[in-house]
Amino acid sequence: PDFFNSDQISRFLKGYDFVDNDSIPQDTNGHGTQVTGIIAADGQLIGIAPKVEIFSYRVSSDGESVPSDLIIKAINRAVEDRVDIINISLGVNMTHAKIDNAVNNAIDHGIVVVAAAGNSGPDKSTIGSPARNPNAITVGATYNNRDSSMVSTLQVGETQFQVLPMLGTNIISDPISTDIIFGKYSRENDFDDLDVRGKIVLAERGGETPDEIVFFSDKEIFASKNGAKGLVVYNNQPGIFFGELIHEYVSEDYYPSIPTVSMTREEGLELKKILESETSATLNVFNHPDFIATFSARGPVSPFYQKPDLVAPGVFVNTTSLKNFYNITSGTSYAAPHVSGAIALLLEKNPELTPHEIKSILITTSDVITDQYKKEFEFDAGGAGRIDLKKAFNSELIFDPPKLIFNLSGQEISERQVIKMNAFGDSINIQKVEFSGEDNVEFDYEVKDSSLYITSKLIENKSGVFESRAFITYNDITYQVPIIVRVTEATIVILEKENELSFQVKRPIDWEYAKITVTNSETYEEQTLSITPTKFESLKLYEAGRYWIETNIKNNEETFDVYDVYDIKTDAKEKKPIVSSTELPERALIILIIIFSIVIVVGFKFRRKNY
């Protein structure tokens, strides 16, 4: 943190500077101070947990990159210092086993580890280590309840499009329902022979040639001068963009007259084709605080567990800055400390809670969130939902595990799993259990003592990944357990004899080859083998624990993926053979932010375009 910031200095206890190798980890970049303020500010701004003690560990000299060995040293030092919470975010779209092992070691020592998901969204599979660690609490970012939480919708006929309001666009009192018409590039001469009065204009970004610059503000001016009610600008290159109407090249007296939004090139071309037969459209711009930030990194990270775990406010967050100033900033970096502060309050109430119990409470008490069309966000984007601190604080039930993944097929149409429930020593009287989700899967349940047994059954043999939730009511509090159901066309059977696994492929019947990867879920050590209809291999597992089984089955030109988990109950009688390995040199990691509660921060910059 910034030792000159009066809102924070009283909260700093100790730490270490791994860059200069001294005991004064002064923040020179500003992000550590911003993150610390969200957790523990105690002045003009009040943090989530203003009375916590802050440990700070500096690992970056320039705020741009950090050697992974310093990250590991900082985590290990935090373990030595016996902190309660470590909050880290690393912007690496990769798995880093040594960092993950350091995180696991911290959790084994009873420390809760919170990881920001990263700022590489909205693309899928953009969460890296340590946020992809299954044991960490991974946090994505939502808007907040400020006026800046603006979203937009565009529906043409029955088709809903993803559109983003441009900077400078204002909320409208009522949706605009009218015809939509293609207006080329929305330049002045594009409206010479085009009547757009009372209509929404669809226009392409830029101009007819690559070097022609047409500001978004000019597109808005010409569309509104010709009587348009709204403007939709689609990209002239793949993907989405964040446009701004207010910029340095616009006149001081300019004020946008009509709502203006952006969309991807792909959807823009699709809409342009739709306009050949359907022109009835509705455009709306409104506040939606629980909308997931576009930059928030997404899963999936693994077929065996789901990330992120939950989301928290991370857009336009007002917090402390260097030299006793304040700053509004955005990033999953600033969503994570909201969760860290909440955890501090939970531990203050009940210091005996374990990291896994804390994680369960936060997941199962999260609020389900929806997009601008009132559709639930996918788990890969929003996890279980937005943190609900009040509900978490009043929670009286812990679920283990707090999420379920079922693997079904046309041959294995049902599966039963168990959730252990803990009511802090009280007897458990479940009032109600309900399920939401897909029509092709049905659920049933049974409560026995402190166990909740959930059975999923395939109704329609449709391959894919389907999302559901179980809603469990206890003592008038309704908890939720996210459920993923994966349906495949293939089936394997796992056989065990004295810690040795063998595999049989049941479907497809005419399979030719199967590659099987077995991963220790704690150490991430992988072993592989291959089998054919005439060649069988087995695999010895020496350590007790849960193993992830991934099977890739080839049949002619098709490939089928099958996933399962298997629990080895005891260690093998014989010792595991020692295999030598060559250590590879560590390379510096590019970081979007790393914050601890313990705090080191490097931020992310998010640029808008004005043409």
Q: Locations of the language-model features?
A:
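Short, solvent-exposed loop/turn segments enriched in Ser/Thr/Gly
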Residues: 411-418, 459-469, 499
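Subtilisin-like serine protease catalytic core
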Residues: 1-14, 22-67, 108, 132-136, ...
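Subtilisin-like peptidase catalytic core
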Residues: 16-94, 140-145, 180-191, 195, ...
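Surface-exposed binding patches on compact interaction domains or structured appendages
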Residues: 399-401, 424-455, 506, 510-524, ...
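C-terminal membrane-anchoring or membrane-association module
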Residues: 597-611
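C-terminal subdomain of the subtilisin-like protease fold in secreted/lumenal serine endopeptidases
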Residues: 85-87, 138, 258-274, 348-425, ...
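Structured lumen-facing ectodomains of secretory-pathway proteins
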Residues: 126-308, 312, 322
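Hydrolase catalytic cores
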Residues: 36-39, 55-61, 126-129, 210-212, ...
